Regions:
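Bacterial N-terminal signal peptides
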Residues: 9-22
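Scaffold/interface architecture of coatomer-like assemblies
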Residues: 25-523
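N-terminal secretory signal peptides that target proteins for export/translocation
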Residues: 1-7
């Protein structure tokens, strides 16, 4: 499918979901057997504090914890003490190792005044300057601006790299911080959470978002029609589950909030809300994601660098418990309702900070895995942040000047691809790939969505994981194209990968296709 002419992001999503993926085209190589599970394993990252708010990291065992889901006791399947997540202070690799939690700093320019944002950046700089030159665990720095979520610095252990990125934050007036743009900021802020979840879903272990700024505005459901309310609630439920699935906790730091405003604060409810109360019931709000992801809101304090430090510690010293829901898989389990999780300790003087629950599948709105994958790659291709869950790069480009199109040839590493065994000792895997040509103002000039099938003559998982696979997509490249971004995900919702080409790279990798042979008319 080709979309010609400038398109908005919403239009791209509409066309992709409406028309879906064309028939998968056979390609070569690849595959690992996919193992289906009929049970769900729920992960809980739990920070324990005493009455004075001090973090408790020792003296507790599996038997000290009790878990209920909607008042039903759950049997603890596994238990990890905080020392299991201790960072390797001597590690030199910037890649998250899945043991120590990683930190994602988000500077919220979109929802801040110019003065507030300047203050928040100064406080962030103060915090970083107080850190060791080599961080104990990788961290990355993002900026939520007027139009996009931008990755300023990818995962690194270098304080110098983070400070450099911070000092070069683009100067921009947050013009959307007015009532006329309230809805736009609401969606942009929540979509930023979705993008971060997609980017990090292939990274094992806990991730902590430290969101520096107010966060997105809430919305009043009474002002919307029933159809709109239903779509909004499903949008929020999906975002909650994306954070849960990626094991992300959200910490929100907004120093300018007055104490008397706390009842109006998004997500001001605690995670111990009355059973059956939907945390997004009534108004949909950004702070609800804090509670349901096991984070915390900090407000009415100007010591932001210390609050960042507190957030990082709360997200770094924790127990991990897992359990299989007792009635998972039953017909009553697919009602789409919120599953309230409560964790208690044998010692009543101790309290826990953990996520409040998750949303069950909804049989009245069944998940179409193909459409969900299309939505995922559409978000990834319109984002500027890297996606490394699926390693891929452009190998070459063959231009067709007569049609202003190009064949983009890719190499995809099979490490995170899910394979299925087939007859004759073979394996197969399917990808959904989306390529987009962008103008200098990030308008969508052209796009191509297609399915790609890989096959391999082995079922050996080690051999399959080491394959380099070839794929190709033909995309229109109009004369005013300034960049191309290609995103892909396995059809069953595995890791997402993305690769980018600026105009210089497009030209340097390109070769011109030979002109088509002319056929002489027969005499």
């Amino acid at each position: 499918m080709r979309l010609c002419g400038p398109l908005s992001n919403a239009a791209l999503l509409f066309f992709l979901v409406l028309f879906g993926v064309p028939a998968i085209q056979a390609q070569q190589n690849a595959a690992v057997p996919t193992f289906q599970s009929t049970t769900t394993l729920v992960f809980l990252d739990i920070t324990v504090v005493d009455k004075k708010g001090h973090i408790v990291t020792s003296g507790l065992t599996k038997d000290d914890f009790s878990i209920t889901e909607d008042k039903r006791p759950q049997r603890i399947f596994s238990f990890e003490a905080p020392e299991s997540h201790a960072p390797n202070k001597h590690a030199s690799d910037d890649t998250p190792d899945g043991n120590a939690p990683t930190t994602i700093f988000v500077l919220d320019q979109l929802n801040s005044s110019l003065e507030d944002f300047s203050f928040l950046c100064d406080q962030m700089q103060k915090y970083l300057e107080d850190q060791p030159s080599h961080l104990a665990a990788p961290a990355e720095l993002m900026l939520l601006g007027n139009r996009t979520l931008e990755l300023l610095q990818g995962y690194t252990r270098s304080r110098t790299d983070l400070l450099f990125a911070l000092k070069h934050v683009p100067t921009e007036t947050p013009y959307k911080n007015i009532p006329a743009f309230k809805d736009e900021r609401f969606f942009q802020s929540i979509q930023a959470l979705q993008q971060i979840a997609l980017q990090n879903e292939a990274i094992s272990g806990r991730k902590n978002i430290i969101w520096i700024g107010r966060g997105g505005p809430g919305t009043i459901l009474a002002y919307r029609n029933i159809y709109s309310v239903d779509k909004l609630e499903r949008f929020v439920h999906q975002t909650t589950n994306m954070l849960v699935d990626a094991r992300i906790s959200l910490f929100l730091i907004f120093p300018g909030l007055k104490v008397q405003e706390i009842n109006a604060l998004p997500g001001s409810k605690t995670a111990d809300t009355t059973i059956g109360l939907d945390p997004f019931g009534g108004d949909i709000n950004f702070g609800g994601f804090v509670n349901e992801s096991g984070g915390r809101i900090f407000y009415n304090e100007n010591d932001v660098d210390n609050l960042i430090r507190q957030s990082q510690r709360l997200g770094a010293e924790y127990y991990t418990l897992t359990y299989h829901p007792n009635e998972s898989g039953s017909a009553a389990d697919a009602d789409g309702k919120f599953r309230h999780i409560r964790v208690t300790l044998r010692n009543p003087d101790l309290q826990v900070i953990t996520r409040g629950g998750y949303y069950a599948p909804d049989e009245s709105h069944p998940i179409d895995t193909e459409k969900q994958t299309i939505l995922n790659v559409s978000q990834a291709v319109q984002s500027s942040i890297p996606y490394t869950g699926l390693a891929m790069k452009v190998d070459s480009i063959v231009r067709h000047p007569e049609s202003r199109s190009a064949d983009v040839n890719l190499v995809v590493q099979s490490k995170n691809i899910h394979w299925e065994s087939t007859e004759g000792g073979k394996s197969t895997a399917n990808l959904i790939l989306l390529a987009v040509s962008f103008s200098s103002t990030h308008q969508i000039l052209a796009s191509k969505l297609q399915g790609i099938a890989f096959s391999a003559t082995t079922q050996d998982q080690a051999a399959l994981a080491g394959l380099s696979l070839k794929a190709s997509v033909t995309l229109r490249v109009p004369y005013n194209t300034r960049s191309i971004r290609i995103a892909a995900q396995t059809e069953d919702g595995g890791g997402i990968g993305a690769t980018d080409l600026n105009r210089q790279a497009i030209d340097s990798l390109s070769t011109k296709a030979a002109p088509a042979a002319k056929i002489s008319p027969s005499l």
